[in-house]
């Protein structure tokens, strides 16, 4: 019975941040409607960030503070990673097999550039790194070696995206983000995630110009 209670507590502690984030996104979607999906997602991220950060600080999670040079390096690495993976996905035609991915991409890249940069390159990386690396990865590291925690948190990150194309992309990026979090702390992981999303936005602009 004690082990069951411990397992339930562990699962509750692990999954509630994602459930909380999804509930915020659902509530924002009801408020703003389907025509403003981007506004709902960004509103959810903005509302989730202070809560997730407070929990991350309360748990006194692992991860050292990165310097400015390390943060800039992580951002540049993220941009390169984002561009390479998006080009590989396009070359493999992976997106064509996922209608939900194409629909999501259509919504996101139809936004004005300023909103794409604000939402996809700032708010979403902050919220997602707090959730998937700051909380989920760190909890896994309490009982798993680094490589296992990286793989499991990357699978969790990929699955949360809800379609095959973004799931594979999220898993591969998630592995790199876990390593960045381990080496450079939360700021390094956030910077790499921001760089990856910025690379994707710039690549989209290049091909649609």
Spans of model-derived segments:
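Membrane interface segments of multi-pass transport proteins and intramembrane proteases
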Residues: 33-34, 97, 105, 138-148
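Transmembrane helix-loop-helix hairpins at the membrane interface
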Residues: 83, 113-209
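Non-cytosolic membrane-interface motifs at loop->transmembrane helix junctions
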Residues: 34-41, 100-106, 171-175
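Hydrophobic, aromatic-rich alpha-helical transmembrane segments
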Residues: 3-7, 11, 15, 37, ...
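Juxtamembrane helix-loop-helix connectors linking adjacent transmembrane helices
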Residues: 59-124, 142
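N-terminal, membrane-interfacial amphipathic/helix-forming hydrophobic leader that caps
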Residues: 1-73, 79-83, 91, 198-209
């Amino acid at each position: 019975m004690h082990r069951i209670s411990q397992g339930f507590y562990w699962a509750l502690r692990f999954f509630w941040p994602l459930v909380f984030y999804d509930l915020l996104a659902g509530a924002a979607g009801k408020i703003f409607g389907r025509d403003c999906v981007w506004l709902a997602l960004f509103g959810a991220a903005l509302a989730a960030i202070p809560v997730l950060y407070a929990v991350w600080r309360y748990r006194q999670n692992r991860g050292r503070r990165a310097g400015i040079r390390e943060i800039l390096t992580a951002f540049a690495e993220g941009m390169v990673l984002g561009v390479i993976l998006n080009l590989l996905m396009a070359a493999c035609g992976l997106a064509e097999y996922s209608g939900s991915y194409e629909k999501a991409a259509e919504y996101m890249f139809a936004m004005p550039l300023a909103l794409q940069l604000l939402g996809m390159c700032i708010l979403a990386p902050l919220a997602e790194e707090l959730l998937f690396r700051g909380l989920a990865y760190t909890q896994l590291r309490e009982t798993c070696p680094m490589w296992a925690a990286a793989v499991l948190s990357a699978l969790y990150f990929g699955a949360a995206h809800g379609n095959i194309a973004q799931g594979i992309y999220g898993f591969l990026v998630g592995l790199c983000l876990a390593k960045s979090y381990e080496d450079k702390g939360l700021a390094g992981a956030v910077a790499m995630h921001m760089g990856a999303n910025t690379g994707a936005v710039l690549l989209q602009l290049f091909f649609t110009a």
